[in-house]
UniProtKB/Swiss-Prot annotation:
Species of origin: Vibrio campbellii (strain ATCC BAA-1116)
Name of protein: Crossover junction endodeoxyribonuclease RuvC
Enzyme class: hydrolase
EC number(s) recorded for this UniProt protein: 3.1.21.10
Function: The RuvA-RuvB-RuvC complex processes Holliday junction (HJ) DNA during genetic recombination and DNA repair. Endonuclease that resolves HJ intermediates. Cleaves cruciform DNA by making single-stranded nicks across the HJ at symmetrical positions within the homologous arms, yielding a 5'-phosphate and a 3'-hydroxyl group; requires a central core of homology in the junction. The consensus cleavage sequence is 5'-(A/T)TT(C/G)-3'. Cleavage occurs on the 3'-side of the TT dinucleotide at the point of strand exchange.
Amino acid sequence: MSIILGIDPGSRITGYGVIRQQGRHLQYLGSGCIRTSEKELPGRLKQIYAGVTEIITQFQPDVFAIEQVFMAKNADSALKLGQARGSAIVAAVNADLPVHEYAARLIKQAVTGTGGADKVQVQHMVQHMLKLPAKPQADAADALGVAICHANTNKTLVALAGKATSARKGRYR
């Protein structure tokens, strides 16, 4: 059993989603958005760090998963996104959490079955997969998608590691 904190970073709105993974079962624990109010970027980064730290304290996750930076057309936006990610990652590292990063296309693939899915499709599938009564906010749904992606990727890696161990045992008898 592990608790996974997923983060969809943004310099103005950072989504978060927390799930519990028990084998193949995923249970929704919480989600929402950290909305920054500061006008200047350093103040927003401080709010992101404080918000993620508070979420870590509240939910006590075992692992931290975050969306990777994608190359945006606007370099300034990409830099701000990278700084927002950094603030969230520092909060995780300060809490001694392992950090895992996933590309947006991989996250969408894990949740919807296609890497080109839009936000509405992600919201719908997250609601369905976690049996939520209503669609989560877009940024929170994306963050839950990050957590779901980690859970699915982690299950696959554990299964592959087990098969590799079994194969090695059989080979050296």
